[in-house]
Amino acid sequence: MARVTVEDCVDKVPNRFELVMLAAHRAREIASGSALTIDRDNDKNPVVALREIAEETQSAESLRERMIESHQTQIEVDEPEEDQMALLMGSEVDRPVQDDMSEEKLLRALMEAQGQN
């Protein structure tokens, strides 16, 4: 195939606009270092992408899926911390009560509770 045109690929991807989108996506993949599935033959990336589609070394369906995935973004929603949530809702922060019981006092209280004094 000396010259690749859109006509050579229309039987693989009937919609010309979709074909252009898929070929452009594949050309960007090639530019970013993706491995070629055919010989370059001194052609530029868009021509190589069209040749890959025409020779069906890249399926239109897999290109379509990769193109869709590349356009999808996931936005993380920051959830407020529990302490901040309580304050936002107008209630007090649920924290343990501060006590001044030392370890020794705690052990004595436990021993007394068990009756081993």
Curated annotation (Swiss-Prot):
Q: Which InterPro entries match?
A: DNA-dir_RNA_pol_omega (IPR003716), Pol_omega/Rpo6/RPB6 (IPR006110), RPB6/omega-like_sf (IPR036161)
Top-level EC class as recorded in UniProt: transferase
Read off the Pfam families from this record. Answer: RNA_pol_Rpb6
Q: Which GO terms describe its molecular function?
A: DNA binding; DNA-directed RNA polymerase activity
A GO BP term, please? DNA-templated transcription
SUPFAM superfamilies assigned to the protein according to its UniProt record, in alphabetical order: RPB6/omega subunit-like
Q: Tell me if Nucleotidyltransferase is a UniProt keyword of this record.
A: yes
Q: What Enzyme Commission number does this protein have?
A: 2.7.7.6
Keywords (A to Z) from UniProt = DNA-directed RNA polymerase, Nucleotidyltransferase, Transcription, Transferase
Report the catalytic activity. Answer: RNA(n) + a ribonucleoside 5'-triphosphate = RNA(n+1) + diphosphate
One GO CC annotation: DNA-directed RNA polymerase complex
Question: Which PANTHER family does the record associate with it?
Answer: DNA-DIRECTED RNA POLYMERASE SUBUNIT OMEGA (PTHR34476:SF1)
Note the NCBIfam families from the entry. Answer: rpoZ (TIGR00690)
Per its UniProt record, what HAMAP family does this chain match?
RNApol_bact_RpoZ
Q: State what this protein does.
A: Promotes RNA polymerase assembly. Latches the N- and C-terminal regions of the beta' subunit thereby facilitating its interaction with the beta and alpha subunits.
**Quaternary structure and partners:** The RNAP catalytic core consists of 2 alpha, 1 beta, 1 beta' and 1 omega subunit. When a sigma factor is associated with the core the holoenzyme is formed, which can initiate transcription.
Similarity comment: family membership:
Belongs to the RNA polymerase subunit omega family.
Full protein name: DNA-directed RNA polymerase subunit omega
Organism (species): Cereibacter sphaeroides (strain ATCC 17025 / ATH 2.4.3)
Q: Lineage in the entry? A: Bacteria, Pseudomonadati, Pseudomonadota, Alphaproteobacteria, Rhodobacterales
